[in-house]
């Protein structure tokens, strides 16, 4: 593997990847937008229908609205994690065709630069697109909300959404970082749906391990929490990332092309 890295070549490959994949990115953006609009409308309609009952039970308007915004943000964040997995699964999907693989190999850049360009497009760039999709969907929900209910109105959920975004670090970012590094040379051996399923299962397994880790440390500390377990957790994630990269360099030879044109 040629490990030479040029930022100039990388920039050209990154621009080429963005231009070449704009339709796929637009499709993912549109799917995220529709999903977020649906989640917000369904959540707030349900809260609006139960509004009178909650007020009757002496629950304040502020508490009802805050709870609705929190639940809506958590729901959208969960779907964002799901959409990130879908985007990662389709990052190298087109390499299952001969012409697509040849076109990528003919680019005047190293394999590392080509991979990093795809990683940047389908992880941080796609994440930003999803966040923008949520913000646009939230504005649209505010505009069209009077059509669904005039009894109670809900403010923007954007601040609450950014408040719960910290969970995305555990759910997706670390997972994608070392999963993609370890699996990118094998992506063309799987259908995108199969890859997505494996990543989705891995995401929930990683989340389960995270919950167990913090629960066990909380029980052991019993009130003497110092925050060191968070540091240990992220150090472990970094070690796993480098281990996956080592495996990626250790086993570089895989079948590249299928028989499809």
Question: For the regions a protein language model found, what residue spans apply to each?
Answer:
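Hydrophobic alpha-helical transmembrane segments of membrane proteins
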Residues: 1-102, 111-261
């Amino acid at each position: 593997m040629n490990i030479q890295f040029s930022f100039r070549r990388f920039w050209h490959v990154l621009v080429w990847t963005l231009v070449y994949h704009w339709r796929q990115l637009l499709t993912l953006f549109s799917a995220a937008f529709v999903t977020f609009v649906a989640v917000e409308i369904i959540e707030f309609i349900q809260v609006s229908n139960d509004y009178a009952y909650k007020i009757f039970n002496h629950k304040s308007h502020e508490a009802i609205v805050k709870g609705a915004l929190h639940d809506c943000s958590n729901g959208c964040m969960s779907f964002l994690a799901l959409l990130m997995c879908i985007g990662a699964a389709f990052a190298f999907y087109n390499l299952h065709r001969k012409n697509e693989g040849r076109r990528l190999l003919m680019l005047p850049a190293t394999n590392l630069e080509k991979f990093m360009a795809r990683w940047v497009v389908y992880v941080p760039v796609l994440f930003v697109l999803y966040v923008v999709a949520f913000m646009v969907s939230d504005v649209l929900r505010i505009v069209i909300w009077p059509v669904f209910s005039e009894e109670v109105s809900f403010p923007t959920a954007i601040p609450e959404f950014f408040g719960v975004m910290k969970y995305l670090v555990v759910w997706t970012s670390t997972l994608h970082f070392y999963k993609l590094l370890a699996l990118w040379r094998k992506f063309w051996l799987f259908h995108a749906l199969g890859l997505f399923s494996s990543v989705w299962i891995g995401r929930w397994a990683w989340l389960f391990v995270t919950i167990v880790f913090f629960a066990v440390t909380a029980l052991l500390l019993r009130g003497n929490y110092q925050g060191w377990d968070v540091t240990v957790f992220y150090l472990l994630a970094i070690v796993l990332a480098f281990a996956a990269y080592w495996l990626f360099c250790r086993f570089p030879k895989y079948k590249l092309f299928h028989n499809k044109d």
